[in-house]
From Swiss-Prot:
Source species of the chain: Oryctolagus cuniculus
Mod. after translation: Phosphorylation sites are present in the extracellular medium.
Gene this protein is translated from: C9
Name of this chain's protein: Complement component C9
Keyword Metal-binding annotated: no
SMART domains per UniProt: LDLa, MACPF, TSP1
Domain of life: Eukaryota
Length: 557
């Protein structure tokens, strides 16, 4: 299919990786006798610092503390705030920066300055519609009679990441600001013209899909876990430290700026999180880590990626949300760890200067290796039954709009004769669990898949992938991005901009060092420590288990 065609095209990629640890011997538990049984380690914090001086502009004073030791071995986790604030009466005057608009500009109710030519054009240029309040005549619509829709891909453009894997609560970009322009972009999948926001330099609807599912299987749990979290932390975080639950105080209106308010689910604390279907990230990883390799489990990872479009953000003159600007102004000029950590947990440590949008389909099948061996079932038999050995084809719509994928699991492939008996793979207790790490898609699909997993349905197959893919255009997420530090977005005109930029640089470095596995007790017998939401965990080599990898397993003669 020619790339010059006006409709979307397909890039076919074949990538099947297989990582194995060789044949698995049978073991029996034989715990090593210990004279010093492991005791729970509770989170230990440093004492609070002294209160800072009273900030004359914020009329607040601050203090902070540090984490000395993380919880471990079922001890209390470190989930309390590291920063504190209280109101105060300043002893010096606040030197506020002048923020008057130019003569040819209109001063919005939000404090934003816009050109007067943008008044009464039907667009929400101010962010609170105050530019549309006093119109003596009918608004002169920017797009006039041209058909155009708001783009979900464009709303998500620029979204960032947190270096520890947490989903930011808000975006810094106002991607519903158009600067009086009506730049339209055609989407061949939905047969719709979408409006390109002012902040987005390039918006292109280009559909690409892996022709084949990428499958990987692991016998070592730690290998599988590293493969999963590499994408969550974008390879920034090398010390296996993950933090999914915000712990610092948040700006009250920051969530309102987030495009994820249209997304699927909420995490444990009630904040909007990024399109997780079955569980919060914390619950998902805890569930995965509850399956140990020593119980003769095998982990099959199935991945499929669909790209719907790509974007490039402008590198200057962008329109930031009012809440983002207010939160920058609310940062103290002196470095206060808790306040800067809160900002990073709200907006992320980095934003996306360019990237692609769509969805990432990722499932972990926990397989019972002993049962597979007993029934004569191989890994390829399971992949074939689930339909993950099939080629996918993308149909370009004609008269009817929408992304159309074809691919069908053949249930006859789920029957296999082995060891003298016919085995039905779907009913043979070969798949212990299916763990979802899917990103993107609408609420309807989320509920359907969640219900399927909660009923312990093991047959999440290629048909579910097709259903998910059809919902992506309504709820895309970032699947690939080029990142830039969040402090690059601080406008130079803001008071103390240079000092706050330096403070944010320091804050990112401190954030990484604060939540580090260096504050965990060592795991025994070659185990690897990882940190998840304030609790240190041990993942063990194949021949050991236990909360510290302290239990040996000896091979049967």
């Amino acid at each position: 299919m020619a790339a010059s065609h006006s409709f979307a095209f397909v890039v076919c990629v074949l990538e099947i990786g297989a990582l194995t640890a060789g044949p698995t011997p049978s073991y029996v538990h034989e715990p090593i006798q210990r004279s010093d049984p492991l005791q729970p380690i509770d989170c230990r914090m440093s004492p609070w610092s002294e209160w800072s001086h009273c900030d004359p502009c914020l009329r607040q004073m601050f203090r902070s503390r540090s984490i000395e030791v993380f919880g471990q071995f079922h001890g209390k986790s470190c989930v309390d705030a590291l920063g504190d604030r209280r109101a105060c009466i300043p002893t010096e005057a606040c030197e506020d920066a002048e923020e008057d608009c130019e003569k040819d500009e209109f001063h919005c109710g939000t404090g934003r300055c816009i050109k007067r030519r943008l008044l009464c054009n039907g667009d929400n240029d101010c962010g609170d519609f105050s530019d549309e309040d006093d119109c003596e005549t009918e608004p002169r619509l920017t797009c006039r009679n041209r058909e155009v829709q708001e783009s979900e891909l464009a709303r998500t453009a620029g979204y960032g990441i947190n270096i520890l894997g947490m989903d930011p609560l808000a975006t810094p970009f106002d991607n519903e600001y158009y600067h009086g322009l009506c730049d339209r972009v055609w989407d061949g999948n939905t047969l719709t013209h979408y409006r390109k926001p002012w902040n987005v330099a390039v918006l292109a609807y280009e559909t690409k899909i892996d022709k084949n599912f990428r499958t990987e299987y692991y016998e070592e749990q730690m290998q599988a876990f590293k493969s999963i979290i590499e994408e969550e932390t974008s390879n920034f975080n090398a010390n296996l430290a993950l933090k999914f639950t915000p712990t610092e105080a948040k700006a009250s209106k920051a969530e309102e700026a987030s495009p994820k308010n249209k997304s699927l689910d909420d995490n444990d604390k009630g904040f909007s999180s990024k399109f997780q279907f079955s569980y919060s990230k914390n619950e998902t990883y805890q569930l995965f880590l509850s399956y140990s390799s020593q119980k003769e489990k095998m982990f099959l990872l199935v991945k499929g990626i669909i790209q719907l479009g790509r974007f490039v953000m402008k590198n200057r003159g962008v329109m930031l949300t009012n809440t983002f600007l207010d939160d920058i102004k609310s940062l103290p000029t002196t470095y206060e760890k808790g306040e800067y950590f809160a900002f990073l947990e709200t907006y992320g440590t980095h934003y996306s200067s360019s990237g692609s949008l769509g969805g990432r389909y990722e499932l972990i099948y926990v397989l019972d290796k002993a049962s597979m061996k007993e029934k004569g079932i191989e890994l390829n038999d399971i992949k074939k039954c689930l339909g993950f050995d099939l080629d996918l084809s993308l149909n370009i719509p004609g008269k009817s709009a929408g992304l159309s994928l074809t691919g069908q699991a053949n249930k006859n492939n789920c029957l296999k004769s082995g060891h003298g008996n016919a085995v039905n793979i779907t009913r043979a207790n070969l798949i212990d669990d299916v763990i979802s790490l899917i990103r993107g898609g609408t609420q309807k699909f989320a509920f359907e898949l969640k219900e399927k997993l909660l009923t312990k349905a093991k047959m999440v197959d290629v048909t579910d992938f097709i259903n998910w893919a059809s919902s992506l255009s309504d709820a895309p997420v970032l699947i690939n991005q080029k990142l830039s530090p969040i402090y690059n977005l601080i406008p130079v005109k803001i008071k103390d901009a240079h000092q706050k930029r330096q403070n944010l640089e320091r804050g990112i470095e401190d954030y990484i060092n604060e939540f580090s596995t260096k504050k965990c007790s060592p795991c025994q017998n070659g185990g690897t420590a990882l940190l998840m939401d304030g609790q240190c965990l041990c993942t063990c080599p194949f021949m050991f288990e236990g909360i510290a990898c302290e239990i040996s397993k000896r091979k049967l003669a």
